[in-house]
């Protein structure tokens, strides 16, 4: 029987909502980098999704340095898990930030005054280059990321390990990791908390940075009028480089969170997740930081609820139906504002 005609279950609705918000927050984390760059230089950086993918492969490589694999991570000591995650949290954002700035300096900087189609096509080209680097780095098949978070939950949360009778039962193992207790019909794990615990503070910090710091005010000046900003003594190239660095770092944080929660990496993942992130940025109002988060949450809910009640086949199409409907009534997105351009 199709999911649409299944008996309605309020607990299932709640669980799908929780899962949708988790995925939406993850999409929002990637979308923040998209909207940050577009808000300053009006460039749709289609390579952003594949930059996120390379960050995932670097996180996988960091696990390899410490000998962590899917088969051995359960026996790893807590200190090794903590050091691995800590090193990934530092190295991956730095790597993505440096790579993003390098691409800007080598590719986008020379196209600042070119027609807008030129940097757009160049971004698509960079995306294909990154995708092939990912293919060379990790191969053509999906690679399982070590379940570092699950292995550490027994230590951090104090949950009892599954008994021998239930050790092979994934359902029973999941129940032991539920923060609401093993008998709760709703499941909230540390994966859910991790995604929100990273996305929401980063959104708040980014908003405060743009609105209240000197560099943030310089970014807004460059976004409004680059020529006038230069006349006021603002180093626009430096501001744009900082913007790309922040956007890349956000992609890197998204990479770490994604690998810890999804546990699967492949070279094509950047395109799909990048498309979701771009859609979230447009849906919320591209260039608007809270809008990117709101757009990501909407996409996560539509995807999760659509998969549960309509069918996974149609969930992707439903996301873009929602996007079209919202843009028909609000062309600037949910939180976007109308801006008049003088000629």
Locate predicted features.
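Membrane-interfacial amphipathic/re-entrant helices at transmembrane-helix boundaries
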Residues: 1-30, 58, 69-86, 114-118, ...
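Membrane-embedded helix boundary and interhelical linker motif in transport proteins
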Residues: 5, 40-102, 106, 165-172, ...
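Single transmembrane alpha-helix segments in multi-pass membrane proteins
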Residues: 13-64, 102-118, 281-289
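Alpha-helical transmembrane segments within multi-pass membrane transporters and channels
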Residues: 71-126, 133, 294-299, 330-331
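Helix-loop-helix "hairpin" substructures at the membrane interface of multi-pass membrane proteins
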Residues: 187-265, 289-294
């Amino acid at each position: 029987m199709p999911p649409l005609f299944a008996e309605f279950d309020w607990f299932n609705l709640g669980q799908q909502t929780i899962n949708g918000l988790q995925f939406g927050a993850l999409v929002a984390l990637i979308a923040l980098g998209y909207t940050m760059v577009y808000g300053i230089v009006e460039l749709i950086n289609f390579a952003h999704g594949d930059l996120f993918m390379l960050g995932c492969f670097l996180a996988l490589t960091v696990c390899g340095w410490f000998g962590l694999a899917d088969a051995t991570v359960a026996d790893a000591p807590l200190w090794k898990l903590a050091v691995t995650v800590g090193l990934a949290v530092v190295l991956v954002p730095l790597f993505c930030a440096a790579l993003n700035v390098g691409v800007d300096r080598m590719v986008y900087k020379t196209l600042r005054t070119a027609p807008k189609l030129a940097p757009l096509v160049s971004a698509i080209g960079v995306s294909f280059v990154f995708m092939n680097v990912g293919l060379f780095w990790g191969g053509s098949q999906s690679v399982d990321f070590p379940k570092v978070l699950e292995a550490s939950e027994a230590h951090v949360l104090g949950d009892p390990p599954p008994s021998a009778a239930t050790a092979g039962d994934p359902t029973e193992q999941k129940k032991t990791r539920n923060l609401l207790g093993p008998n709760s019909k709703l499941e909230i794990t540390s994966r859910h908390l991790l995604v929100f615990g990273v996305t929401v503070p980063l959104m708040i910090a980014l908003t405060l940075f743009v609105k209240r710091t000197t560099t943030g005010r310089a970014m807004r000046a460059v976004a409004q009028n680059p020529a006038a900003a230069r006349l006021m003594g603002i180093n626009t190239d430096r501001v744009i480089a900082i913007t790309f660095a922040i956007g890349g770092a956000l992609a890197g944080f998204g990479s770490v969170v994604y690998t810890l929660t999804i546990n699967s990496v492949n070279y094509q993942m950047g395109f799909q997740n990048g498309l979701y992130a771009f859609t979230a940025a447009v849906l919320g109002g591209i260039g608007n930081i809270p809008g990117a988060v709101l757009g990501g949450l909407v996409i996560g809910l539509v995807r999760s609820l659509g998969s549960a009640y309509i069918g996974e086949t149609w969930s992707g199409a439903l996301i873009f139906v929602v996007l079209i409907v919202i843009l028909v009534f609000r062309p600037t997105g949910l939180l976007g504002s109308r801006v008049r351009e003088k000629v």
